[in-house]
Amino acid sequence: MILIIYAHPYPRHSHANKRMLDQVKVLDGVEIRSLYELYPDFNIDIAAEQEAISRADLIVWQHPMQWYSTPALLKLWIDKVFSHGWAYGHNGHALKGKSVLWAVTTGGGEAHFDIGSHPGFEVLAQPLQATALYCGLQWLPPFAMHCTFVCDDETLQAQARHYKQRLLDWQETHNG
């Protein structure tokens, strides 16, 4: 099962993320949890989230880039849900054998994320990748949709279809 942890602070105002979700919500074996709709007060039900993760083979962190990072609620979700003794540490093996995909949208172009002489997007992924690897998750190459503020609808739809295909390809590889 694919579990999409969707973290858009203003989901009704989304253009790119909405199209991405519209493409994948019709797939078999996909569950979408919209954090800002579930937890507008930031009071995360840790047990419910851990139960959802336990059913998943692939976890997708889908969100818009905000100041070169994740939205606040996704960061809090990781901090709370990936708890010691469950996700890492002594007896913390709940995530081992699962995969994670970072699916992010940006308003700027890919070159906008170059930081000095460093390839910015790879640098920006490092905290999430380090968290994933520390918890025993397999880190998959990220999916990024850039320039979403200036893309026309046709381009956004094409990118959303590409996202859907990434998930279909993963399902085909892992479900035989």
Swiss-Prot record:
Topological category with respect to the lipid bilayer: Peripheral membrane protein
Molecular function in Gene Ontology: electron transfer activity; FMN binding; NADH:ubiquinone reductase (non-electrogenic) activity; NADPH dehydrogenase (quinone) activity
Cofactor names: FMN
Location within or outside the cell: Cell inner membrane
Record carries keyword Oxidoreductase: yes
One GO term describing the cellular component: plasma membrane
UniProt EC number: 1.6.5.2
Class in the EC hierarchy, top level: oxidoreductase
Binding site for FMN: 8, 14-17, 65-68, 105-108
Secretion signal span: none
One of the protein's GO biological processes: positive regulation of potassium ion transmembrane transport
Keywords from the UniProt entry: Cell inner membrane, Cell membrane, Flavoprotein, FMN, Membrane, NAD, Oxidoreductase
Keyword Magnesium appears in the UniProt entry: no
Catalytic activity entry: a quinone + NADH + H(+) = a quinol + NAD(+); a quinone + NADPH + H(+) = a quinol + NADP(+)
Purpose of the protein: Regulatory subunit of a potassium efflux system that confers protection against electrophiles. Required for full activity of KefC. Shows redox enzymatic activity, but this enzymatic activity is not required for activation of KefC.
Subunit structure: Homodimer. Interacts with KefC.
NCBIfam families membership: PRK00871.1
Family: Belongs to the NAD(P)H dehydrogenase (quinone) family. KefF subfamily.
Listed name of the protein: Glutathione-regulated potassium-efflux system ancillary protein KefF
Gene name per UniProt: kefF
